[in-house]
Amino acid sequence: MSRTLDLILLCRLVQDTAHLLMRITLQWDINEMSYFYSASTNGFYSTEFHGTNIPDDAVEISESEWETLINSQGVTKMITCGENGHPVIVDRPSPTPERLALINDEKKSALIAEATNVIAPLQDAVDLGMATDDETKLLLAWEKYRVLLMRVDIKNTEWPKKPEGNK
């Protein structure tokens, strides 16, 4: 029994020591990590992940600059190369007419699919003679909405208003 307890305590000590060493190593790595930005790839690099495999045109940036850039990009903002090869945040360009048509076509398809999903159980209730007056009215509103969606010109969109309620 005593040997088992000693073995358990020894294992626990080894685990705690390994955990402490990992934390110290991680903290050292974080403090020693350098960040770089490459204009030729429009990408970021760190010594932790890329070692010395960093493009020749890369410029060193601070961790806070890297965090600001990463957190600032999004739907309307993007990272690009500025003066002296340093990264900057700029407004994303407006989509081309072709890209906008593609986006609108995808939206149109998604809205039609949503309408179809709402219509199906309402239509079942009507077909089976089980629909309430509200369900019948809702079915007609959603069917009209779906027809209007099918008629939307993806190059010049005016989206119809979605019906209230979707049982």
Curated annotation (Swiss-Prot):
InterPro entries: Phage_T4_Gp38_tail_assem, TFA_Chaperone. Disulfide bonds: none annotated. Keywords: Chaperone, Viral release from host cell, Viral tail assembly, Viral tail fiber assembly. One of its GO terms (biological process) is virus tail fiber assembly. It comes from the Viruses. Belongs to the tfa family. Chaperone involved in tail fiber assembly. This is Probable tail fiber assembly protein. It comes from Shigella phage SfV.
